[in-house]
Amino acid sequence: MAMTDPIADMLTRIRNAGLAKHQKCDMPASNVKLAIVNVLKELGYIKNFKQISDDKQGILRIYLKFDNENKHIIHAIDRVSTPGCRVYVGKDEIPVVKNGLGNAILSTSKGVMHDAAAREAQLGGEVLCSVW
């Protein structure tokens, strides 16, 4: 059976690996996933990532980040826009996650970026997920 939402699958893999205290998690790679993971690294939610080539589409390996008490840095990572219900926002309607403690990740005409960068560039787009 084909996967209907690969981004939700990626977020679930990150969430489950963090709850299980794994240091890394692997998943099939794609350009959108790579862009989302790049934003997560820029925001400091993950340590690092690398793309491993194989015979198919490649593997994306994400190294998770934990605090001093060995708790996962990401408290919650949720999909907002799904294939069945897309959520688009204008430049003035970009959501504030947890009163500014979290971040929303958007897909805009200038690429995938976090909510603060989209507000600064005055761009709206599709709200892919929220992280805090």
Curated annotation (Swiss-Prot):
GO terms for biological process: translation. Keywords: Ribonucleoprotein, Ribosomal protein, RNA-binding, rRNA-binding. The keyword Ribosomal protein applies. SUPFAM superfamilies: Ribosomal protein S8. The keyword Ribosomal protein applies. Coiled coil: none annotated. It comes from the Bacteria. GO terms for cellular component: ribonucleoprotein complex; ribosome. GO terms for molecular function: rRNA binding; structural constituent of ribosome. Belongs to the universal ribosomal protein uS8 family. Part of the 30S ribosomal subunit. Contacts proteins S5 and S12. One of the primary rRNA binding proteins, it binds directly to 16S rRNA central domain where it helps coordinate assembly of the platform of the 30S subunit. HAMAP family: Ribosomal_uS8_B (MF_01302_B). This is Small ribosomal subunit protein uS8. It comes from Syntrophotalea carbinolica (strain DSM 2380 / NBRC 103641 / GraBd1).
